[in-house]
Curated annotation (Swiss-Prot):
It is found in: Cytoplasm. FAD binds at G7, G8, G9, L10, A11, G12. The keyword tRNA processing applies. Its EC number is 2.1.1.74. This is Methylenetetrahydrofolate--tRNA-(uracil-5-)-methyltransferase TrmFO. It comes from the Bacteria. Its cofactor is FAD. Belongs to the MnmG family. TrmFO subfamily. The gene is trmFO. GO terms for cellular component: cytosol. It catalyses: uridine(54) in tRNA + (6R)-5,10-methylene-5,6,7,8-tetrahydrofolate + NADH + H(+) = 5-methyluridine(54) in tRNA + (6S)-5,6,7,8-tetrahydrofolate + NAD(+); uridine(54) in tRNA + (6R)-5,10-methylene-5,6,7,8-tetrahydrofolate + NADPH + H(+) = 5-methyluridine(54) in tRNA + (6S)-5,6,7,8-tetrahydrofolate + NADP(+). Keywords: Cytoplasm, FAD, Flavoprotein, Methyltransferase, NAD, NADP, Transferase, tRNA processing. Catalyzes the folate-dependent formation of 5-methyl-uridine at position 54 (M-5-U54) in all tRNAs.
């Protein structure tokens, strides 16, 4: 019983771990560091190339529910994230380097996993395989997958935010607070007056951007939209978006700022901070010039500039089943952002389901289709039931889950949906596993 997993990102690492935990021998292929991508910086597994946040912890948030469901299956990614988390108020954020290093250690030390660092350019259709090559799939493998699925790849762009050193932030201006007072005050906040914001806004929308290739249409995912593109929607868009000041009163003045830029810890030591919501494709000198206009960041030292990259994904509703298996070729599974799920936790979830099912298929057991009342099942259902004519990446959200049978007050509806999901998942586990 041998399973091939192609791609050592979040989905591939989770898929390999889940299958290995079922007693299956796994060959996990990762091309880095032999061959790298435009977005990756290291050769470690499960490298986080965008934010260091796995989003909300609360069960009143769908991402919080999905994380809790993953923990029920001893998810490798969740286990490591919980071990290396950094303070981030109501969110689960991690030390970026420690996270990928620890995932790599778990994989390398697992007796049932062989980690092979080389590029895969062919897919053996007779060999049970999980394809988790990510949104930056290499050209040669993209062509092979297109032949397998019989469809062209779709694509969108997303971007990463810059990171600055803690010591270069002016703490006489920036202050600690968490929005609405939720959790501990783990965010550094840079306040802006109306005049400061308007000056910053003009510089931002007029700054030079890295051009796209002339033949490529600019399609961006809302959750990773460049800050300058968001600003172009209107002068107040940022003030009602990532720069909203609500709940962040400035203790130095006792007043509510006109706008606030939040910075979140990027490593456990607290020496690095990322600019929350500042994904960008501005040219690097422009990032330094424009972002130093933010009060408190006048002397900011940038250790990583924001970058933008092209993400590709298959038209899953045309080709996949709800257990992430290729309809026309049983035994071949897809997982991660290449399927059209969007986000770290969502990629992990698809890897978990694909890895479990690949192992079960190898062992001659029935594959699992998760109940759609669960976050795991709702996400998988979206992937196969969305319109193939306009298929777009999707984060987990309560809108994907069925309505409650009984009407409840709006303020407790999400909590009740989470309670139902976890109860149904427990019953599903007892019945099927």
């Amino acid at each position: 019983m041998r399973l091939t997993v192609i791609g050592g990102g979040l989905a591939g690492s989770e898929a390999a771990y889940q299958a290995a935990q079922q007693g299956v021998t796994v060959d996990l292929y990762e091309m880095r560091p032999v061959k790298t991508t435009a977005a990756h910086k290291t050769g470690e597994l499960a490298e986080l190339v965008c934010s260091n946040s796995l989003r909300a912890k609360s069960l009143e948030n769908a991402a919080g529910l999905l994380k809790e469901e993953l923990r029920k299956f001893d998810s490798l990614i969740m286990k490591v994230a919980d071990q290396v988390q950094v303070p981030a108020g109501g969110a689960l954020a991690v030390d970026r380097e420690a996270f990928s290093q620890k995932v790599t250690e778990y994989i390398e030390n697992h007796p049932n996993i062989n980690l092979i660092t080389e590029e895969v350019t062919e897919i053996n259709e007779s060999q049970p395989t999980v394809i988790a090559t990510g949104p930056l799939t290499s050209t040669s493998l993209t062509e092979r997958i297109q032949k397998l699925t019989g469809t062209d790849f779709l694509y969108f762009y997303d971007a990463a935010a810059p990171i600055v050193t803690y010591e270069s932030i002016n703490k006489n201006i920036a202050y600690w607070a968490s929005r609405y007072g939720k959790g501990t005050p783990d965010y550094l906040n840079c306040p802006m007056t109306k005049e400061e914001y308007e000056d910053f806004y003009q510089e931002l929308i007029n700054a030079e951007k890295v051009p796209l290739k002339s033949f490529e249409k600019e399609v961006v995912f809302e959750g990773c939209m460049p800050v300058e593109q968001m600003a172009n929607r209107g002068k107040d868009t940022l003030v009602f978006g990532p720069l909203k000041p609500v709940g962040l009163e400035n203790p130095n003045t006792g007043e509510m700022p006109y706008a606030v830029v939040q910075l979140r810890k990027d490593n456990r030591e607290g020496t690095l901070y990322n600019l929350v919501g500042f994904q960008t494709r501005l040219k690097w000198p422009e990032q330094r010039r424009v972002f130093r206009k933010i009060p408190g960041l006048e002397e900011a030292e940038f250790v990583r500039y924001g970058v933008m990259h092209r993400n590709t994904f298959i038209n899953s509703p045309k080709v996949l089943t709800a257990n992430y298996q290729l309809r026309e070729r049983p035994g071949l599974f897809f997982a991660g952002q290449v399927t059209g799920v969007e986000g770290y936790v969502e990629s992990t979830a698809s890897g978990l389901v694909a890895g479990l099912n690949a192992a079960r298929k190898l062992q001659g057991n029935e594959t699992l289709t998760f109940p759609r009342e669960t976050a795991l099942g709702a996400l998988a259902s979206y992937i196969v039931e969305a319109s193939p004519d306009n298929f777009q990446p999707m984060n987990i959200n309560f809108g994907l889950l069925p309505s409650l049978e009984k009407k409840v007050p709006k303020k407790i509806k999400k909590q009740k949906q989470s309670e139902r999901a976890l109860k149904i998942l427990e019953e599903f586990i007892e019945r099927k596993l």
